[in-house]
Amino acid sequence: EILIGLVGSEMCIRDRNKRDDIQSRNMIYWQNIPYGKGGNIIAIACNNGKEVARHMLETTGKAKALKIELENADWKADGMDLQYVKVYAVDSKGRVVPATEGEVTFEVSGEARLIAVDNGDHMTDELFSGNHKKLHQGFVMAILRSSQTSGNVKIKASLKGLKSAEKKMTTK
């Protein structure tokens, strides 16, 4: 079963759907949850009365800045190694703001080059090439390829109206 609701208010319970009921087996529908009024929504999954998973979504503020996260801590200068640079639109508390729209522009300097940009939106026909990409769910990614020379790399992500983000890395 799943319990869901706003933190501090009454939780709604949803029993497991019957697998032989074609109408509802893959449907999750909740009633009486006051969406859109702010606060934190929590979902708790239970199996035989024991909690097995928990997830919480927080209401965010307005996007204020971009934030960069790197995937590869050990980046090799072999001309083939990739660095996945994740960029998020965040509020003043650092929370991702999924409703943020706009196009992020990337600037890369040093011992790497920008080879692709993506945002995870499967419904777009935008190309992966270029140095800019629209945010999707507050997210965009740049993919960098190292050169064959060890050295420093700098990437900057900017979006009009938000504070830019910059990250320095080293290839070895």
Where are the regions a protein language model picked out?
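Beta-strand-rich extracellular modules
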Residues: 44-48, 158-162
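Extracellular Ig-like/FN3 beta-sandwich strand-entry sites
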Residues: 36-40, 80-82, 150-152
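Single conserved hydrophobic/aromatic residue that forms the stacking wall/gate
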Residues: 1-8, 12-13
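Edge beta-strands of extracellular beta-sandwich domains
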Residues: 50-61, 163-172
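Beta-strand-rich structural segments
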Residues: 80-98, 104, 154-157
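Low-complexity, acidic Ser/Thr/Pro/Gly-rich terminal tails and inter-domain linkers that flank the onset
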Residues: 60-76
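Short aromatic-acidic-glycine turn motif
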Residues: 64-68, 107-123
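Short, hydrophobic beta-strand segments
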Residues: 28-35, 127-148
